[in-house]
């Protein structure tokens, strides 16, 4: 049976205390809180899957309640002259795997986009 770890930045982003018998953990707002508390909970519970509930901005006309998955995102990155804008020097090296864990996709940001800033988001 798979073990799920359900996360939310605040209790305002969901209306349940549990999901499929698993507690929804509040991890706090921002990427530092997300990284620190998600890591702590993964170490404690050793889940098979981590699911984060919450709000996200977008530049398209998605509706509230639609489920979005992240494929590949470049954000908050400007390490020129070491790499192209939106990339790190590690871009293109392939996937990184945590020891003993399956392929992992992870994304976090603390920037707020709206349609008036679309030019910035598309750099």
Predicted ranges, named:
Residues 4, 8, 12-123:
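Glycine-rich phosphate- or other oxyanion-binding loops that anchor nucleotides, phosphorylated ligands
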């Amino acid at each position: 049976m798979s073990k799920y770890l359900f996360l939310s930045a605040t209790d305002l982003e969901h209306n349940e205390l549990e999901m499929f018998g698993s507690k929804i953990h509040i991890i706090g707002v921002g990427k530092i809180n997300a990284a620190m508390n998600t890591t702590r909970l993964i170490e404690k519970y050793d889940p098979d899957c981590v699911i984060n509930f919450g709000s996200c901005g977008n530049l398209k006309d998605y509706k509230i309640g639609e489920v979005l998955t992240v494929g590949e995102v470049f954000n908050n990155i400007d390490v020129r002259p070491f790499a192209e804008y939106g990339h790190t020097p590690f871009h293109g090296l392939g996937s990184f795997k945590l020891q003993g864990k399956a392929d992992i996709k992870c994304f976090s940001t603390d920037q707020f986009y709206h349609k008036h800033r679309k030019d910035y988001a598309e750099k």
